[in-house]
């Protein structure tokens, strides 16, 4: 299952389910807003993801509300993210946004959002293809 939504409550529910059921092929996708470099996308455990405010909130809530481990221990939730810093839009662009974590405040680049999705899909396909049983 691929979680590619931007709603924290939904992400939390899916990630909690994946951890508790030990889902073999679950991955959550971080925020692509404000990112410009598709080649910097990575897949790791959420415990080591950086530069992603949405995943940081998810990680914090998994720890606080659902007992996920601290101290650098893996949380058993794979994620797609980029260590690239979020870039605010140029002031000359006159972008109107609500300032939330959705892309409307920062904008998004299709090459980055597509790469996030393709990486998530490829990861799930590889997990399914390499599994002896599901």
Regions found by a protein language model. Give the residues of each.
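ADP-ribose/adenylate-binding Rossmann-like module
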Residues: 2-49
